[in-house]
Amino acid sequence: MARYLTVLGTQSHVGKSILVTALCRILKRRGYRVAPFKAQNMSNNSWITADGSEIGIAQAIQAFAAGAEPRAEMNPVLLKPKGNMTSQVVVLGKPLGDRVVGQYYESIESMMAIALNALYKLSEDYDVIVVEGAGGAAEINLYDRDIANIPLARAIHSPVLLVGDIERGGVFASLYGTIALLPPGDRELVKGLIINKFCGDPSLLGSGVGELEKLTGVPVMGIVPYSGLRIPSEDSVSLGDKKPEGLLDVDIAVVRFPLISNFTDFEALERIARVRYVSLDDSLGRPDIVILPGSKNTVSDLKMLKNSPLASEICSLASDGVPVIGICGGYQMLGRQVVDSGIEGGMPETIDGLGLLPVTTVFDRYEKCTCQSTKTVTGAGPLLAGIRGSAVTGYEIHMGQTRTDSPAFGDDGCVSDSGTILGTYLHGIFNNASFTDAVLKYACERKGLRYVRPEGVRDPYDELADIVESAIDLDAIIRLIESQDKV
């Protein structure tokens, strides 16, 4: 049975997910059997496990870092926002249905029970479970409905590391204030503080660290530098973060829909070329590649796209031979029509797509396809001809059925007669080197450039683990873990 370590934050986006990823790899390298856990995750970015369960992609990434197979128990409750205070609720990897906030909170006790049962089941197979919290640890307006932070740590008697983000300023106040807002009995769970995303010389923090330790009675166990590593991220807020300089002079424009989902599809590209996310009220400019990503609500985002200048820009670029690629909801939007019986938009309606691919998508039942897939490249044209017959892998998470007579990947997707407009339901397709090479090679050739595949880089999980391990008091953290009785 397992011991626990819980990582909570002073607020959202302080770096909890990436620190849990690092800790999973660090503990794995120390010989522990490790798994991640997040009771409740709110994200439109998800991963499909081997058995077809849907979990937050952050937990899948953390599992990979731990050398573990992603499982539904690692993220028992996934909330996928759809707008209008409504989220699709995914429980143990399967969609339960759409719920408004009030409806969801009515079932919060049962959700806590589900989360604890999943954690205990996971604990049977691992030595250490690294638990990630959600949002801020001391949201006092939600404390009685919180299943992911201090109430969970209290239930499992787990030591807590509290993380603050110095990059955004006010880290001492946020760490002190978070502890001060916790009920006295719960403050004792916080055993260590982590100052994250520090740039510069740690000695510049001066007496601040000592004063913080004196005020809180909790030791600072790490001052972690900003790394800039491209580990897949969870929240769309990270799309505005700093990006490293691209290796290729290829400009890739990704349409940033209001309800964008699975934007991690493009993080493999970000390590190779210049990727920018373009909002609907901006202009695409003259990119070398245009990508329409997945959407949590195709109907809503398609309507907004068509009412924006980007719709005509996409069509114009496509007619000029610029590669246009749609993934999942983006694929559906590239077609002739989207026929909705009320599943997506609430009312039956038919919406014209961009008309760039000869497909029609029909939403006629509340049924989601979730599976891992391996497809054979069957499409023709300049993007696919060079890799025709090869295999590509990915995963599908979508509602609606799309039919075509010009499939790109066996029974999936569609490719235009020109061969430069492509749609697919495969998330993660850019993780296939052969496909990515083919697309980038064509984009380079159009610019008169020679495409040279970037040389391999070191495993980013080990690189991240090295950075974090050198910046934390790992011995103290391991003592926290080992001091617990096994559950």
Swiss-Prot record:
Keywords on record: Cobalamin biosynthesis, Glutamine amidotransferase
Pathway: Cofactor biosynthesis; adenosylcobalamin biosynthesis
Gene Ontology molecular functions: ABC-type vitamin B12 transporter activity; catalytic activity
Active-site residues from the entry: C328, H427
Coiled-coil segments: none
GO biological process: cobalamin biosynthetic process
GATase cobBQ-type domain location: 249-435
InterPro entries: Class_I_gatase-like, CobQ/CobB/MinD/ParA_Nub-bd_dom, CobQ_GATase1, CobQ_N, CobQ_synth, GATase_3, P-loop_NTPase
Family: Belongs to the CobB/CobQ family. CobQ subfamily.
Family matches, as HAMAP family: CobQ (MF_00028)
Function field: Catalyzes amidations at positions B, D, E, and G on adenosylcobyrinic A,C-diamide. NH(2) groups are provided by glutamine, and one molecule of ATP is hydrogenolyzed for each amidation.
Protein name: Probable cobyric acid synthase
Organism, scientific name: Methanocella arvoryzae (strain DSM 22066 / NBRC 105507 / MRE50)
Gene name in the database record: cobQ
